[in-house]
Amino acid sequence: MFASIVGAISNFMYSYLLIVMLVAVGLYYTLRTRLVQLRMFKETIRVILEKPVGADAVSSFQALMVSTASRVGTGNIIGISTAICLGGYGAVFWMWVMAIVGGASAFIESTLAQIYKKRGEHGSYGGPAYYIEAALGSRALAVIFSIALIATYGVGFNMLCAYNLQSTFIAYSFYNEATTPWVIGGILAVLVGYCLFGGGRRVIAATSTLVPIMGVIYISVAFVLTLINIDQLPAVLGKIFSQAFDFQAIFSGFAGSCVMFGIKRGLYSNEAGVGSAPNAAAAADVSHPVKQGLVQMLSVFIDTLLICTATAFMCMTSGVEPVKELAGAPYVQTALAASMGGVAKVFITVSMVLFAFTTLLGNLYYVDNCFAYIMKAVPGPTFNMVYRAIACVVIFIGAGSSMGLMWDLADVLMGCMAIINLPVICILGGPALKAMDDYSKQREAGKNPVFVAKSIGITQKLDYWQK
């Protein structure tokens, strides 16, 4: 009953609300920024290659490479394979479309996060909650957004992540549908709890080191296997474009169409316009907000157009046909096995264990920040203990739940964030657009752009950009 209700809400949100909002806002800012995705692409590369500001500082290029490698996970691997199995080859095309138009939305929201960021003891912080309160003057809406983010990352994404991790074990003979998910969920919950309650520093350090390495290995394997099966690529591309524009199939069952799955899984992977990336963008130390807007825009392209496409091509050129029964980890494992043999399932399992574990901890970091915003202070030890215990229980339950429910729940909660953030960035886009023009003028004058809020008409007192 609950699963069917959540599924119906998800279908309604993405069939009638989010598809219009995501495309409309993306196209709107693509036009308002005068195709910033293409026009400033060369400048984006220049920003990425800028030297760090200090001897101990991390360069933009290093930060981007580490974050990109670390983002290879459930969204890029299992999310894309699920989209292909349930939505067909055409889902890949609509995933590309959402990444391209979504890049403009990502540029705006991350630039806003930089403009309105706050000064903290250990650097800057911010995100949608902060620009909603500072620029719109609505703490109530900011709190609602924070609650939506807590629900999305602390519940929806972590439950889905736990499910996706345990689903990689389906390929093994010892897997028992009734017991194995709960056993794996229990082990995962204990490990996460061990790290959350003050221990596990070595575990966190080890996984943080291994994840970027495994990310690079995964991307390399995906490209190599695609090259091995390069003769299949023309046929695959033909299916992608033909199915993407099979309008009879699309509109006869829109909720299950390639458009819908392309949008859902693309959004889950790159999060453009959702309002999560600005939380990380606000922490960057740059001379001009637009620099971080460009970096986050490029991150969307790398995440979807590069990494997700690598997964899609690796699977689709393998000769293994995507069917509903293989949705999720089994399709990736079966596709890899066609070229790598039995080692494929072990490779995917090890990859997902590392990716999922760090994702679970990273998601809870976002949650911590939102609780701090809502409570106007860092939560006390008793609150943290209760919340972290609940977080572990949520992970355990997620591992033993059904695939359909977990994806639908994550989609609905993520959609709630987007429904709040997209109208907000439409209302507040003015300062970001003015900042972009200010940046362009300084670059045309041969300067390294330095932002001063008053230069674009922002008169309110900000923690940064005063002079």
Listing of model-derived features with the role each one plays in the protein:
Residues 2, 32-37, 76-80, 89, ...:
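Transmembrane helix-loop junctions in multi-pass membrane proteins
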Residues 1-74, 84-91, 102, 426-467:
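N-terminal alpha-helical transmembrane segments of multi-pass membrane transport
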Residues 35-60, 82-84, 88-92, 104-136, ...:
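Flexible loop linkers connecting adjacent transmembrane helices
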Residues 7-43, 85-123, 302-310, 345, ...:
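Extracellular loop-to-transmembrane helix junctions
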Residues 54-86, 112-115, 121-129, 133, ...:
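Alpha-helical membrane segments and immediately flanking helix-loop junctions
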Residues 30, 107-117, 121, 223-239, ...:
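Extracellular/periplasmic helix-exit of transmembrane alpha-helices
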Residues 25-30, 98-122, 128-129, 133-163, ...:
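Helix-loop-helix module between adjacent transmembrane segments
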Residues 21-28, 32-45, 164-169, 180-228, ...:
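Membrane-interface loop-to-helix entry segments
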